[in-house]
């Protein structure tokens, strides 16, 4: 078995080396640092969060996409005002499938796209007056209690003072107006926008309201964007056990609830990359501990629920947890097993953002499938190697323009968990830690950061995965000539994929993709070509 693993690692490394030969020497040297063929017997490192090589077709987004599209966009009762050209404003609920329902007596502005529509004359003479007028119109039409201003590239280039416009609008209209300097060039990917949005949430929202009736089991759900209704799949499970979700950040989120997030007893973190900044700052200022979790897959959901029960250490809560786990597993086990038999032995290639690639490795394995390549669009090294690597990460030039905010503990805060218990839980359940993707990628798996179209073509054609899971930008690039594909960013209008029932939904969708009769009418290139 050892010789077989060594042979696989050697073959995959040769594939990577051959794939990079077409690039100029300097570019090839750069990309080689972003690709690792897993060898679990040795310590490995990967380069990430670096600027894209000019001329390479990347799948990344910009800082504006990270702030407006990912973090701010799903907050339903705020009007998100794009200050910039109309082309930037398309990044809305229609592209992300963030679902939301209005709170009782509340608002839901998710379906609206509001933009200042800057023109050439605004670039020349400035856009501040146009921004003020847009805010006035938003207040007149929608009567929101809060507005965000999301700046695009031209705004930063001409120097519009969106902060002063926001302050004046707050005084004039008596509402919250939150400016975000999220111009697209502020960082190497959408990850910079996540950071900017997290800072804004802490500065302007979190800690500004109080929970009227606290309960012993109040929690936050961080890094959940309710794609296709994912949050709504797991929320009833939490409530059945006895938890109350104070705030979801930010899927189906309300700015009032986000303002109360500091009073939760525990924050669970789904997408590590997009919002771990807020978790860290909340723990520093308000003492709210966080727990990295994965509720995609039966095993992941079980593990999460048991860790949460361990954190609260309440006998009745623990009993209810086991009861709900047994009940939910029994509902879907038989149907899941039918699909597992059909999918066993199939291979998958995953390329996504946030923590999704990691989570779906676990889910594919649960279905008997093997992940042969995986990677992230906008990860940092700790998303691959774990948070223990953070002290060793050197700050890059573009990273220096992002404000890394730290807080002192609020003297009025009384910790709900003692420091001794926190240390104990760090060992028991991995509280406030994340081990990264590497530990769950087996020997020979190609782990690749910032996958580009050339690499997609070579890897998919050579590895011949049974399915390619990524986003809309590269879905058809892989699907047309080679492999069936599924989006795991917006689920191809399907889902939900979280919790116990999500496993069944996902297995059904993968089975349809792999065994659709339409594939009988297509001859893959590697079957048509004379391969020696």
From Swiss-Prot:
GO MF entry, a single one: nitrogenase activity
CDD domains: Nitrogenase_MoFe_alpha
Details of cofactor binding: Binds 1 [8Fe-7S] cluster per heterodimer.
Catalysed reaction equations from the record: N2 + 8 reduced [2Fe-2S]-[ferredoxin] + 16 ATP + 16 H2O = H2 + 8 oxidized [2Fe-2S]-[ferredoxin] + 2 NH4(+) + 16 ADP + 16 phosphate + 6 H(+)
Keywords, sorted A to Z: ATP-binding, Iron, Iron-sulfur, Metal-binding, Molybdenum, Nitrogen fixation, Nucleotide-binding, Oxidoreductase
Residues noted as binding [7Fe-Mo-9S-C-homocitryl] cluster in the record, renumbered to the chain: 271, 489
Residues binding [8Fe-7S] cluster, per UniProt: 62, 88, 153
Subunit structure: Tetramer of two alpha and two beta chains. Forms complex with the iron protein (nitrogenase component 2).
UniProt function note: This molybdenum-iron protein is part of the nitrogenase complex that catalyzes the key enzymatic reactions in nitrogen fixation.
Descriptive protein name: Nitrogenase molybdenum-iron protein alpha chain
Gene assigned in the entry: nifD2
């Amino acid at each position: 078995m050892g010789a077989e693993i060594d042979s696989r690692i050697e073959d995959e490394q040769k594939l990577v080396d051959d794939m990079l030969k077409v690039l100029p020497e300097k570019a090839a040297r750069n990309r080689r640092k972003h690709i690792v063929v897993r060898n679990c017997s040795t310590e490995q490192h990967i380069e990430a969060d670096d600027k894209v090589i000019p001329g390479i077709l990347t799948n990344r987004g910009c800082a504006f996409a990270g702030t407006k599209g990912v973090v701010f966009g799903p907050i339903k009762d705020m009007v998100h005002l794009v200050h910039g050209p109309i082309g930037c404003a398309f990044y809305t609920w229609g592209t992300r499938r963030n679902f939301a329902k209005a709170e009782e007596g509340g608002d839901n502005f998710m379906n609206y796209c509001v933009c200042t529509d800057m023109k050439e004359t605004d670039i020349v003479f400035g856009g501040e007056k146009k921004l003020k007028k847009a805010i006035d119109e938003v207040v007149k039409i929608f009567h929101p209690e809060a507005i965000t201003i999301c700046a695009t590239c031209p705004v930063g280039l001409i120097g519009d003072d969106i902060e002063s416009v926001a302050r004046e609008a707050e005084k004039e209209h008596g509402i919250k107006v939150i400016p975000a300097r999220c111009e697209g060039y502020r960082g190497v990917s959408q990850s910079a926008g996540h950071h900017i949005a997290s800072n804004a949430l802490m500065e302007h929202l979190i800690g500004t309201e109080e929970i009227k009736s606290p309960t012993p089991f109040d929690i936050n759900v961080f890094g959940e964007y309710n794609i296709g209704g994912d949050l709504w799949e797991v929320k009833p499970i939490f409530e059945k056990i006895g938890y109350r979700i104070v705030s979801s950040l930010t899927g189906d989120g309300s700015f009032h609830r986000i303002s109360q997030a500091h009073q939760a007893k525990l924050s669970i973190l789904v997408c590590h990359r997009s919002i771990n900044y807020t978790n860290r700052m909340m723990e520093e200022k308000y003492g709210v501990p966080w727990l990295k979790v994965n509720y995609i897959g039966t095993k992941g959901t079980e593990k999460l629920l048991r860790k949460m029960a361990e954190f609260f250490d309440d006998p009745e809560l623990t009993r209810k947890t086991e009861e709900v786990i047994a009940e939910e597993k029994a509902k879907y086990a038989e149907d899941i097993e039918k699909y597992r038999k059909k999918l066993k032995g199939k291979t998958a290639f995953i390329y996504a953002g946030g923590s999704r690639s990691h989570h779906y490795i676990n889910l594919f394995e649960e279905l008997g499938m093997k992940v042969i390549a995986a990677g992230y669009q906008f990860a940092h090294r700790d998303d691959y190697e774990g948070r223990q690597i953070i002290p060793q990460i050197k700050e890059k030039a573009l990273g220096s323009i992002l404000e890394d905010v730290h807080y002192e503990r609020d003297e009025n805060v009384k910790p709900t968990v003692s420091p001794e218990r926190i240390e104990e839980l760090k060992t028991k359940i991995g509280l406030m830690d994340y081990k990264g993707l590497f530990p769950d990628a087996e020997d020979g798996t190609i782990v690749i950061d910032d996958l580009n179209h050339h690499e997609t073509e070579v890897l998919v054609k050579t590895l011949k995965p049974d399915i390619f899971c990524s986003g809309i930008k590269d879905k058809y690039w892989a699907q047309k000539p080679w492999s069936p594909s599924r989006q795991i960013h917006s689920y191809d209008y399907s889902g939900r994929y979280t919790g116990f029932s999500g496993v069944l939904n996902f297995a059904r969708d993968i089975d349809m993709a792999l065994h659709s009769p339409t594939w009988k009418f297509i001859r893959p290139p590697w079957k048509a070509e004379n391969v020696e």
